[in-house]
Amino acid sequence: MKKLFLVLAIAASLQAFDAQAQVKSPAAALSAVQKAEATTQNAKQAAKAATWVKYADALMDAYEAPKGNFWLGMSRQEIDMLGGGEKPSAEQAVDVAGRQMTKLVYSNKNLYLNENGQLEVIEVSAPLVDDVLTKAFDAYKKAAELDAKGQKTKDISEGLARAACAGEVNGE
């Protein structure tokens, strides 16, 4: 019976994992930012809203990439199983706002597990791009200025909402 529950739990975890947006590797995300940024330097391409939306989207992917395949609510077992081979360099008991949490230290991020062993905070300690959210916001703003016909309004609105939500989470 225990084996059946274990198999069902693993299947549910894998299904939840597939439901998550596929996160680019940090190297791929940084490469995409560099390529999109180079496109914005081309005068002909820089006059198109789509160029700026693509650049802003690449910046947002670069913002998310260091988080890896982790998501809020993961259990410690899921972190160990689905972490993509990443292992923490240190594990510490820390006090966060009066709450005892377990801090898992990685090369580019810190994961904070609550008292129930669930992932509650993902702190990126080594962002791929400096001031990435401001740059993404500015790129979406530039896209909106160039989108006279309103063809990219939906993409711009979704991107701005994504950037704003990320900024709220990080207190920016």
Locate the predicted segments by residue:
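Short coil/linker segments at helix-helix boundaries
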Residues: 58-172
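Start-of-domain marker
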Residues: 20-67, 71
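Generic surface-pattern signal
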Residues: 6, 38-41, 145
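A general structural-boundary detector
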Residues: 19, 42-43, 123, 158
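Bacterial Sec-dependent N-terminal signal peptides
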Residues: 1-29
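A near-ubiquitous, low-amplitude feature marking generic local secondary-structure context
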Residues: 19, 38-39, 119, 154
